[in-house]
Amino acid sequence: MINWTKKDKEFLYEICEKLRDQVPFTFSRFGDGEWLAISQAQPDGINCDGNKYYADLGKRLEEIISKKQDYYIGHQNVNAYTLRKDYLQDWVNSDIFHELSEMQGLDYIFDLLNSVHVVYIGNESLSPLPFVDEFIEIPYNNVWDDYDNVLNEIKNKINDNIHKTFLLSAGMACEVFVHDLWNFNKNNTYIDVGSVFDPYVGKKTRSYHHRLQHVSNIFQL
């Protein structure tokens, strides 16, 4: 059972307000995969999506997390591998959207995203999401191999005349993407949404996806 703290509820309310009002922000999410990449505890391993724990990716992630950032950085509430205590950040709940999906569905989030200009960066299966205005297709895993090209493609979507909300499903590289994009242009919103929308395109890639009761209320293939 999910029990949100007062801080969790306030955080969700705050970012939903910012989405609605098109106030720029960035939301980065550090989970066990990011920490394993940083620690290089499994240098030849891969995460659940087949993404490699690249040493140079781990180095970038550590550089980012070692400095206090001016954007939201999330940490999982679940009991998983973490190095959080070694890094000073104003940690928020990284799974706030995932937990909302499990608790009541994402109807409200879909409505919010339908009201703004969304650029989605993800694998081909996510392109049918109904709120997407522009889509950048990336591989199902290991986008880090083509990081610079993808970053430039995303930057080319930035338009000084319109606020855009960039949603990224790009594995552990997400945290580097949103960091570099935020520091390139702080007039847009950049969110690591992870796998939260997978069930809404018919893909159950996480164990909690099998428990969802509200997916069909929003979108069906």
Where on the chain are the PLM-derived regions?
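Residues at the C-termini of beta-strands that transition into short coil/loop
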Residues: 77, 136-139, 194
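Redox- and metal-dependent alpha/beta enzyme cores, enriched for Fe-S-associated oxidoreductases
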Residues: 112-154
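Short catalytic-loop micro-motif centered on adjacent basic/acidic residues
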Residues: 165-169
